[in-house]
């Protein structure tokens, strides 16, 4: 991750398998105000040791799914990120 | 009204029915998902649900508004999901809807459970017999990341059409429906057939048909042409087979007999039809038969008439006596002129018999 712009601190929530791998249900992370989803995912995966499930993860930003990993995301201080493995509700 | 809830206690179905009740509703549909005790042959000891609470409720509400936009008459919608440990055979999720008529209720509930499994961030972990770690289940309908495994960013690539591989440039793609395709094939087949037919005519047509006659009504087999009847005022087309080869056209073929005899005769390559040749022809077989039967031979005569004469002779002789052949005379004319008379039985009267006996007596007296 390149720190070529302002950086904000956001909350990260982990669920299911990702929580077991990260060893915590929530944490915080510094992210640039503008970043592509792929880079964000890579950063989270490397920081929290989620490599084994990387290809099945979806991210949610402020309770909305990030559908395309090529999307650019704009962060504000205190935003909420969630690491979401494949669902098994119902 | 929309009732969306995450609960930690057993779901109260009766309460949900109360939530659905409405005077204007004739139907309510309730889906209950319960926990199973087995998965792929493994026995489930316990299972537990966890959720991203705030987002789960948000997604469940989105489902409700989706339902209302698709099915306008829905009255009440209930989506309850249980979290934490759920014992086997208890309800983990209840989705219900009520509406004036049943189709909306039934369809909307079915849609809703599919949507829940796809979008709502809830996870289930199952612990199996003999396995302490447990397993996080994954719905096959669950949303998945869209990128490919290789991580390649297709969106960043400019679009370039590869034309150089696979399809040869000599091929053309035709996109038509089945009916059109069948029609085209049929037309092609017919055209090919006509082509072959006209080729046949050209290949097989006889030389004595004038080539500038219209051959469109001809095929190689009949060689038919249109001939207008002379002095006919009729405007109908008369079609006559102009077949110069058949036995019915004998008068048009004066040399027919000759040609036929040629066929019957020698194949030693002599093509000159002179009398000399005919004499030396080994119609000798027929000659032998004729002489044996006592008939005159005439090589000039039509071969069929000769054979016919022999046949007639045979029939005649057979009718006379089956052992005729031992008594055949070699003078045909006399034989023909005076065929042996049949012996007729004579019936005698009594007086004739008496006279006859008397004569014999008289004769015997002399001896």
Curated annotation (Swiss-Prot), chain A:
Coiled-coil ranges from the UniProt annotation: none
Post-translational modification note: C-terminal thiocarboxylation occurs in 2 steps, it is first acyl-adenylated (-COAMP) via the hesA/moeB/thiF part of MOCS3, then thiocarboxylated (-COSH) via the rhodanese domain of MOCS3.
InterPro entries the record matches: Beta-grasp_dom_sf, MOCS2A, MOCS2A_euk, Mopterin_synth/thiamin_S_b, ThiS/MoaD-like
Pathway(s) of this molecule: Cofactor biosynthesis; molybdopterin biosynthesis
One cellular component term from this protein's GO annotations in UniProt: molybdopterin adenylyltransferase complex
Gene3D superfamilies the UniProt entry points to: 3.10.20.30
CDD domains the UniProt entry points to: Ubl_MoaD
A single BP term in Gene Ontology: Mo-molybdopterin cofactor biosynthetic process
Residues recorded as bearing Glycyl adenylate in the entry: 90
GO molecular function per UniProt: molybdopterin synthase activity; nucleotide binding
Keyword annotations from UniProtKB, A to Z: Cytoplasm, Molybdenum cofactor biosynthesis, Nucleotide-binding, Phosphoprotein
Sequence positions bearing 1-thioglycine: 90
Location within or outside the cell: Cytoplasm
Subunit structure of this chain's protein: Heterotetramer; composed of 2 small (Mocs2A) and 2 large (Mocs2B) subunits.
Its biological purpose: Acts as a sulfur carrier required for molybdopterin biosynthesis. Component of the molybdopterin synthase complex that catalyzes the conversion of precursor Z into molybdopterin by mediating the incorporation of 2 sulfur atoms into precursor Z to generate a dithiolene group. In the complex, serves as sulfur donor by being thiocarboxylated (-COSH) at its C-terminus by MOCS3. After interaction with Mocs2B, the sulfur is then transferred to precursor Z to form molybdopterin.
Protein family per UniProt: Belongs to the MoaD family. MOCS2A subfamily.
HAMAP family tied to this protein: MOCS2A
Further comment found in the protein's record: This protein is produced by a bicistronic gene which also produces the large subunit (Mocs2B).
Name of this chain's protein: Molybdopterin synthase sulfur carrier subunit
Organism of this sequence: Drosophila simulans
Lineage, broadest ranks: Eukaryota, Metazoa, Ecdysozoa, Arthropoda, Hexapoda
Gene name of this polypeptide: Mocs2A
